[in-house]
Swiss-Prot record:
Forms homohexamers in the presence of ATP. Interacts with host HDAC1. Interacts (via LXCXE domain) with host RB1; the interaction induces the aberrant dissociation of RB1-E2F1 complex thereby disrupting RB1's activity. Interacts (via LXCXE domain) with host pRB-related proteins RBL1 and RBL2. Interacts (via C-terminus) with host TOP1 and POLA1 allowing DNA replication. Interacts with host TP53, inhibiting TP53 binding to DNA. Interacts with host preinitiation complex components TBP, TFIIA and TFIID to regulate transcription initiation. This is Large T antigen. Isoform large T antigen is a key early protein essential for both driving viral replication and inducing cellular transformation. Plays a role in viral genome replication by driving entry of quiescent cells into the cell cycle and by autoregulating the synthesis of viral early mRNA. Displays highly oncogenic activities by corrupting the host cellular checkpoint mechanisms that guard cell division and the transcription, replication, and repair of DNA. Participates in the modulation of cellular gene expression preceeding viral DNA replication. Zn(2+) binds at C292, C295, H303, H307. One of its GO terms (cellular component) is host cell nucleus. Keywords: ATP-binding, DNA replication, DNA-binding, Early protein, G1/S host cell cycle checkpoint dysregulation by virus, Helicase, Host nucleus, Host-virus interaction, Hydrolase, Inhibition of host innate immune response by virus, Inhibition of host interferon signaling pathway by virus, Inhibition of host JAK1 by virus, Interferon antiviral system evasion, Isomerase, Metal-binding, Modulation of host cell cycle by virus, Nucleotide-binding, Oncogene, Phosphoprotein, Viral immunoevasion, Zinc, Zinc-finger. DNA helicase activity requires Mg(2+).
Length: 619
């Protein structure tokens, strides 16, 4: 069933194509026309029906005229092959034809020629002169390279050299270009503004040198090559008088950079391990010392002590540096490295002396001519701490002796007592006095390894507010603190080194530091209790609480938790002989200042005020 001529024209119009073509073309045109005529696409329903009818009719007609070849090797293919070749052998393909002879031609041997003529002699191969020998050691001889240069030498004929001179100068806007004659040929010495490949220069010149020889080289040693070219005959150059020697060796001012060592020394002197804090502190040095307002601040005497011209000049460079954080990170790493070296090489007594020397320097700043604090306020805090325990000076002295000697299984002080009895205050003061870190032992076991990593290179540690599972007070929350401590027997004993780790750092093997364990009234496991060398129980005293509340000068400024306050407690209550020889001079000096500025009578009055819950400073 074939399409009539009218139906054929109608189908062409609906498909919008000049010719239907084969089945594949018909199908593509039909799918495209469906998007136009389909009612869902906004087309005419009648036109779509008519298109579908005519398409199906045309597809049947096309398939009827298309023969399909059966699969090779099957019986159907054998039958098709016989039908296809039927009658082929009977056809006579012979053609009776006689060729007329061509004009009489004499067979001439190859290369024969008419008498009297002469063959054109073959052209001799053109030879290009070698590149000037005197320049070879200063140019690159690489055949294929992507390296870029800003200095080139072109070697070509005398005529092409004159032609290339203005062409190159216009194309590359050369800083310098000169044309020389060398043994009858041209040498072009070129310095461009930017860098280019040798083949780019060669491609430009080859457009002018289709027949003439051309050699382009990148120059490795521009000054030496120019000096050799100056021995040739000069034809032209774009700079009158040529290039001065200073062109190749310009006098450059030495670029000043940030002195990293100076920043590291500053970080070590203030023992800063926080990169962001160090960055802020060092940027304060950008102002000249004589105009610095920070130096006039009585609370910033450490800044005044370090603010010198060297730091000011370096801080100005540091201010414009793009690597501020990197510099500060390295400086803080230097502080940590020095601390680790001290922990490995110094005795614990020497480490404590260093710590206390820093505290004495801080006391000079606080109570000196520029300081804002009053020694009497600190001594009020000392008398309050002394009232916490009947033998507080002896407790502190024995604790310091214990952490300095650091004997195995004789390394920890247990502070136990009810809520709000002063355990945390004592622990914080001793950390300020000796240096150390706080550890949260109540965390889950999987986090415990990184928590213990805080003890790396520390003098002492505090296991703060350790929780247990049983207690005499039902109101206390239970926890796994003592269970975790029980699993850290090697850490508490201090007999063998243990592995400590922090995130993004390698493990460190060291003896775990001694320290303090504070807890409320929990039942302590026996295996933990026997590892507590000193045990101190504190009691809640309402008058202590009341006197502290009435004396804002002491509680508001956190004097009770300051290492300086605890050092003053030892200075006042212990004899000079209890201190090492390096510190005895400072101890004598501060004993005299306490006697002069406060006096025993006022201190006795402070003690009575504390016992009565009054303002400690009231006379």
């Amino acid at each position: 069933m074939e399409l009539t001529s009218e139906e054929y024209e109608e189908l062409r119009g609906l498909l919008g194509t000049p010719d239907i073509g084969n089945a594949d073309t018909l199908k593509k045109a039909f799918l495209k026309a469906c998007k136009v005529h389909h009612p869902d696409k906004g087309g005419n329903e009648e036109a779509m029906k008519r298109l579908l009818y005519l398409y199906n009719k045309a597809k049947i007609a096309a398939s009827a005229t298309t023969s399909q070849v059966p699969e090779y090797g099957t019986s159907q293919w054998e039958q098709w092959w016989e039908e296809f070749n039927q009658g082929f052998d009977e056809q006579d393909l012979h053609c009776d034809e006689e060729l007329e002879p061509s004009d009489n031609e004499e067979e001439n041997p190859a290369g024969s020629q008419a008498p009297g003529s002469q063959a054109t002699p073959p052209k001799k191969p053109r030879t290009s002169p070698d590149f000037p020998e005197v320049l070879k050691e200063y140019v690159s001889n690489a055949l294929f390279t992507n390296r870029t240069y800003n200095c080139f030498i072109i070697f070509t004929t005398a005529e092409k050299g004159k032609e290339l001179y203005p062409c190159i100068q216009a194309a590359y806007k050369c800083t310098f270009i000169a044309l020389y004659m060398y043994n009858g040929d041209s040498v072009l010495y070129i310095i461009t503004v930017g860098k280019h490949r040798v083949n780019a220069m060669e491609n430009l010149c080859s457009k002018k040198c289709t027949v003439s020889f051309l050699q382009a080289k990148g120059v490795l040693k521009p000054q030496e090559a120019y000096n050799v070219c100056c021995t040739f005959e000069l034809i032209s150059q774009n700079i009158q008088g040529g290039l001065p020697s200073s062109f190749f060796n310009p006098v450059q001012e030495e670029e000043k950079s940030v002195n990293w060592k100076l920043i590291s020394e500053f970080a070590c002197s203030i023992k800063c391990t926080d990169p962001l804090l160090l960055m802020a502190l060092y940027l304060e040095f950008t102002t000249a010392p004589e105009a610095c307002k920070v130096c006039d601040n009585p609370r910033r005497l450490e800044h005044r002590r370090h603010h010198t011209k060297d730091h000011t000049l370096n801080a100005l460079l540091f201010q414009d540096s793009k690597t501020q954080k990197t510099i500060c990170n390295q400086a803080c790493d230097t502080v940590l490295a020095k601390r680790r070296l001290d922990m490995k090489t110094l005795t614990r007594n020497e480490l404590l002396v260093q710590r206390w020397q820093g505290l004495f320097q801080e006391m000079e700043d606080l109570f000196g001519a520029r300081g804002e604090e009053h020694l009497a306020h600190r001594m009020a805090a000392v008398m309050w701490l002394n009232a916490l325990h009947p033998n507080m000076p002896d407790v502190i002295f024995n604790y310091i002796k214990m952490v300095v000697e650091n004997k195995p299984k004789q390394r920890y002080l247990l502070l136990k007592g009810p809520v709000n009895c002063g355990k945390t205050t004592v622990a914080a003061g001793l950390i300020g006095l000796c240096g150390g870190a706080y550890l949260n032992i109540n965390c889950p076991p999987e986090r415990l390894a990184f928590e213990l990593g805080m003890a790396i290179d520390q003098f002492t540690v505090v296991f703060e507010d350790v929780k247990g599972k049983k207690s005499s007070k039902s109101s206390l929350q239970t926890g796994i603190g003592f269970e975790n401590l029980d699993n850290l027997r090697d850490h508490l004993d201090g007999a063998v080194p243990v592995n400590l780790e922090r995130k993004h750092q390698n493990k460190v093997t060291q003896i775990f530091p001694p320290g303090i364990v504070t807890c409320n009234e929990y039942d302590i496991p026996l295996t933990v209790k026997i590892r507590m060398y000193q045990k101190v129980e504190l009691l809640h005293n309402y008058n202590l609480y009341k006197s502290l509340k009435n004396t804002e000068e002491v509680g508001k400024k956190r004097y009770l938790q300051s290492g300086i306050t605890w050092l003053l407690l030892l200075i006042y209550f212990r004899s000079v002989d209890d201190f090492t020889e390096k510190l005895q001079e400072c101890v004598v000096k501060w004993k005299e200042r306490i006697e002069t500025e406060v006096g025993d009578m006022w201190l006795l009055t402070m003690k009575e005020n504390i016992e009565q819950g009054k303002n400690i400073l009231e006379k």
